[in-house]
Amino acid sequence: VEYEKRNDKTFVDGERHRVWGADVSIINRFGAGRRRIVLTQEHLAIITPNQISLAQKQKLLGDWYANEVRIVGAELIDQWAPVLQVTPGRLFVQKMKSKWGSCNTQTANIRINSELAKFPKAALEHVVVHELVHLLEPSHSNRFYSLMDQFLPYWRESKALLSAI
């Protein structure tokens, strides 16, 4: 599966964007209220009360991706923390250039890349579990990978998908 590295999208109707590993087409609509994005099975609707610039559409979509990752990431943390018997700190979501996630083992805070909303949810699950496992084993030691194998046996497939970028 090919994922775009560059942001050369123009946000015209019919243009394809990735959401949770699926290609969906953009539709631009005018509507009352605040600017928003609505995801259907086939479309990513950008709804605005008036015409907005390309930069504004990029920011709107970037914020929407971050919110999606925040929601699903929090659900995954709530699901996995008891399984791993860890107590994570706060979840931070932001666009990152060189990492998919990080864990501060002192504060137990987890930081996740908002771009993960473009990949299948299994990739986000892999990153969440990876960062939570760091609360048990801070380094990428043999023990760390043994814990990953124990809790998420298919983690290598997700890692390969993310490493291909």
Question: Residue ranges of each PLM-predicted region?
Answer:
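Active-site-proximal or metal-binding-adjacent scaffold patches in catalytic folds
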Residues: V1-H126, L135-I165
